[in-house]
A protein has these predicted regions:
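Catalytic core of non-heme Fe(II) oxygenases with the double-stranded beta-helix
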Residues: 48-158
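Non-heme Fe(II)/2-oxoglutarate
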Residues: 1-72
Length: 158
């Protein structure tokens, strides 16, 4: 199961994080494939990984961490997909093979989203909406066709 929360962050915190992510100050790292069945490109910016802060902009994700009330962070990264001419659903996957939580905070509106395998449900991209679920839940990214970019913040935590 998953839980969806609208207006997750206070507007000032959400706007500060979004302003950073759409600015020229963010370092996006290029990935030539989102999965093995396509050559669809994507980008990410890692804030936290392997028990260390990996971004000078970590301060922007602190309100997210506080609101989630997790005990420990595994990884926090922003993912950027560029507009596609047609909708594409990536392969289903799980984030980690052990018990933990995943939260996806949508930074932009659009017709993309996250597809869950069981139950067969889609959560659409809506600004400041978050979906929280067990990291072993099979899910898939869905690309957008109606917006120049889809940005999500992916948080894995205990």
């Amino acid at each position: 199961m998953f839980k969806v929360i609208q207006n997750f962050l206070e507007p000032k915190d959400f706007n500060a994080l979004k302003s950073f992510l759409i600015s020229e100050d963010v370092e996006w790292h290029y990935h030539p494939q989102i999965d093995l069945k396509t050559d669809k490109e994507w980008f990410n910016h890692c804030f936290f990984n392997n028990n260390e802060i990996t971004s000078n902009a970590f301060k922007f994700v602190k309100p997210v961490i506080q609101k989630l009330e997790g005990k420990a962070i595994i990884r926090i990264r922003a993912n950027l997909d560029i507009q596609n001419p047609k909708t594409y659903q990536c392969n289903y996957h799980t984030d980690y093979p052990f018990e933990c939580k995943t939260a996806i905070l949508y930074m932009t509106d659009g017709n993309g989203g996250t597809q869950f395998k069981n139950p067969n449900k889609k959560v659409s991209c809506k600004e400041n909406q978050i979906v929280i679920f067990d990291s072993q839940t099979q899910h898939s990214a869905i690309t957008q066709t109606d917006a120049k970019q889809k940005i999500v913040l992916n948080i894995n935590y205990f």
